[in-house]
Amino acid sequence: MKQIIPALITLSFSPMAIAALPPQYQNVKDLEAMVNYVKENPDVAATLKSIDLENQTINYGQDCQVTFERKPSPKPLGWAGPAELLQFKAINCPRE
């Protein structure tokens, strides 16, 4: 009985421990969102300079930049779920 209680406690918290997406998978999801934006916008694709995953920006044209953001997703205390998808935030140049 003494061994069962710690095991049950450990198992009850294990879904929370594995709920977060490992960084490499989150990075791939973020990069896919940014690449999809480039694919959907020929003017950006034609003058693409760089994709900055860390700052969540796409640089293109003459000093043009597209920024992305992650919407906050409130989670219960102690819950470590996957992050929300990156979404378009702003563009600092007019689209052609």
UniProtKB/Swiss-Prot annotation:
Domain of life: Bacteria
Signal peptide (UniProt feature, chain positions): 1-19
Protein keywords: Signal
Protein name according to UniProt: Uncharacterized protein ssr3402
Organism in which the protein naturally occurs: Synechocystis sp. (strain ATCC 27184 / PCC 6803 / Kazusa)
